[in-house]
Amino acid sequence: MDGYEATRIVLSRIQSLDPENASKIMGLLLLQDHGEKEMIRLAFGPETLVHSVIVKAKKELGLMNCSRSPWSHQDELISPKNNRGSSLNPASLPFYANGGRSSRDLTNDFELMDDMNSRSTDFLGSVHARSGSCVLDGLGYGGDSDLGFGGVPCSYFARGFCKNGASCRFVHSDGGADLVGSPSRIELLRSNSVPPRLAHHFMTRSSLPSFSTKGVNLQQNDVQRAAAALMIGDELQKLGRWRPERIDLSAMACPASRQIYLTFPADSRFREEDVSNYFSTFGPVQDVRIPYQQKRMFGFVTFVYPETVKSILAKGNPHFVCDSRVLVKPYKEKGKVPDKYRTNQTTERELSPTGLDSSPRDVLGGRGFYNNTQDVLWRSKFEEEILELQSRRLMNLQLLDVKKHFQLNSPTNIHSPNPFSQSLISPRPLSVIKREYDGGEKGKGSSKEGSDDDTMNLPERLEDSLPDSPFASPAHHLLLFADSADNNGSDLWSPSSDNDDNSTPSTLSDSFNSFNYQMPRLPAIGMLPGRGGPTCRVGI
């Protein structure tokens, strides 16, 4: 256990026995400079030992009789001539060496210690003669601190992460350890006679350099004496200009409520120290950060208390720092979308239903509606059937377009069918005409005619668009077209020629052999079902 922890325990034990005079008694003990071991012994000693220390300290402070005013006694304590017990030898301590000594002997022992240590004399004299900032500079708590004494705490590290890491010029340390382990610094803030910068430095400077053990002990003793001298007199609060309250730990846990956002012109030339000096008139400043920018136009100021931020915002804008116009805004952290909200959005998106006309790959949206794989297979099979029906319908429309091209007696070759042909908009009446050719000048065979409007008419004058080469016959083209359609699962028609007079040259009729072609039966899509389909014997 270190001296700070022991001091905290002793202070708590004294407060439990005498809460009104605990700060004064603790200040006297710190001025007497008992040492770490004796403070630890007092922290873990019996209750009677602590009670005897309280009684003796109250007698020394003059709190037992009311004849002496507290102001005169404080002058005796702080005065270099009458300061008592600045350097006590632990071996000669009446509290610890012999608990059975009389109070008269103890008083004589205290009266013998009138000589004050030179370091304490100089330091306590400087408390009255110099300002608080000069005192801190003498102790190594200066702002620039060339020797490396202490440092301003990093506000980013206090929030949880600092991007600069070990190369950061601010101190990465947990300030809570100092607040808990150093009651003298907490009590120091209660004194209204302390300037804001003095209180701020006592709160934030966490450690002293360890050049040598003797130097560390000297500096710790000076800090303890300064704290004790400032917290002995609670009446000094009436003379102070700044009256801080107790530390609000809830406000310390939420740094956003203790920060403000500054905006200023790019041509401003003030430094962070100037900003700290200006805003310290409103309350204690913990940190000032002006990030590096090409044209610096904003910064952040962190205060010790959130009430300081409220008072600054209530004053309004503008503020002037070194003749530069500064605007103050409340600091707001960037909003973060909670993971729970994002998860709910993803779940709702996955559970959104899809229609039957969706793609087969769009099963991700409706995955939550299927309990097993059979439902998924049934859905995919059903969609495949719909796609097959649509492909058959498209094939029928293409054949209708081929029919329209033949009816227009086009002298050129057959063009690629257009599914968006005008024949779909205004269809003509359909009829089935079957005629038998016997070639050349042979007689005409019998033919069947049907006038059903729901049946498909075969293409007319197919011979007019025949190519010159016999190897590119339309019959061969239609057979290949029918085979490719059969592979896709579709049923096709086979066109036959229309036997008009003077439509087919007689010279071409002898070059081909006649053959019979069985047309496949059409499904019930736009046509009436036939028994076997018409048989067309083409003889050209």
Swiss-Prot record:
Amino acid composition bias (Low complexity), ranges on this chain: 490-511
Which Pfam families does the record associate with it?
Answer: PABC_AtC3H46, RRM_1, zf-CCCH
Zn-finger (C3H1-type) residues: 148-175
One of the entry's Gene Ontology molecular-function terms is:
zinc ion binding
Which EC number(s) does the record attach to this protein?
A: 3.1.-.-
Modification type Phosphoserine: residues = 451
Q: Name the source's superkingdom.
A: Eukaryota
EC top class, as a word: hydrolase
**Which residues does the annotated region (Disordered) include?**
337-365, 436-469, 490-514
Q: In this UniProt entry, which cysteines form S-S bonds?
A: none
Q: Where is the sequence biased in composition, kind Basic and acidic residues?
A: 337-351, 436-450
Q: Which SMART domains match?
A: RRM, ZnF_C3H1
Residue limits of the RRM domain?
Answer: 258-334
Keywords (alphabetical) are:
DNA-binding, Hydrolase, Metal-binding, Nuclease, Phosphoprotein, RNA-binding, Zinc, Zinc-finger
* Functional note: Possesses RNA-binding and ribonuclease activities in vitro.
Name the record gives this protein: Zinc finger CCCH domain-containing protein 46
Q: Which organism is it from?
A: Arabidopsis thaliana
